[in-house]
Amino acid sequence: MKLSIFFVLFFIAIAYCQPEFLDDEEDEVEETLPVAEEGREKSCITWRNSCMHNDKGCCFPWSCVCWSQTVPRNSSRKEKKCQCRLW
């Protein structure tokens, strides 16, 4: 009899405390997620030489836009630049 009362109280305690543990885990995920997103954004917003191998879909939902530019101004040498852009 005492054992069954113990188990009933034990399961009630587990059921009562468990949502607190889940809430704590969700809070931790929410705290670390913006840091991870911010790091990803910094690594994605860089100049590229090509739109190939777009790591982890960095440009999504944007698109990777490439163009050629002359480097330095009096030279005929052209350099290809690519960047993630909304338009």
UniProtKB/Swiss-Prot annotation:
* Record keyword Protein biosynthesis present: no
Entry keywords, A to Z: Calcium channel impairing toxin, Disulfide bond, Ion channel impairing toxin, Knottin, Neurotoxin, Secreted, Signal, Toxin, Voltage-gated calcium channel impairing toxin
- Where does the protein end up? Secreted
Source organism superkingdom: Eukaryota
Listed disulfide bonds for this chain? 44-59, 51-64, 58-84, 66-82
Q: Please tell me in which tissues this protein is expressed.
A: Expressed by the venom gland.
Q: What else is known?
A: According to the nomenclature proposed by King and colleagues (2008), 'Gsp(267)' comes from the species name 'Geolycosa sp (strain A267TDLS2-KZARNA)'. This species has been reclassified since that study, as indicated in the work of Oparin and colleagues (2016).
What is the protein name stated in its UniProt record? Omega-lycotoxin-Am1d
